[in-house]
Amino acid sequence: GLSEQQRHAFLHWVKHFRLANPRQLKRLHNSYNLLRHFYGEDGASAKPADNIGDLVKTLEFPLMITLFALEYLNSLDDPPLRTQLKSSLRGRTKLAFEDEAQPKIRQSLINPAVITLVNRAMPGSQLHLVDAVEPFVLPAIEQNVEAPANVA
């Protein structure tokens, strides 16, 4: 099961990413446990955090946050925004959070702290966190919106 610190972090990041569906939460819990068993314990430092504030400041569980960030992205209804935010998690694009032309990005829950945490390789590996975690996340539903054909 989850340690006390992991439970506190789980609740914090569920609230941060506004994930509330009970089935979704159960799936995320199970996916996180699978990630921990597959890759090993999730990046907890040797010195445990003293309280939830320290835990959040140190962003102690990168697999968990990557899992939740990808879940959040895959739930977005705006495919171009989803693509741009996912690219930022991989460090491929720099988001202009201060740019008035991009209000959707500023309103996104993918903030600079999340990007900084997720844009890294797995410990002891060259595998990017996003690439490591993505197979454990329910994929986004992609819809091709085409103009209806003229029916005569």
What do the PLM-derived regions correspond to, one by one?
Residues G1-A152:
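The feature marks long, low-complexity, polar/acidic/proline-rich intrinsically disordered regions embedded
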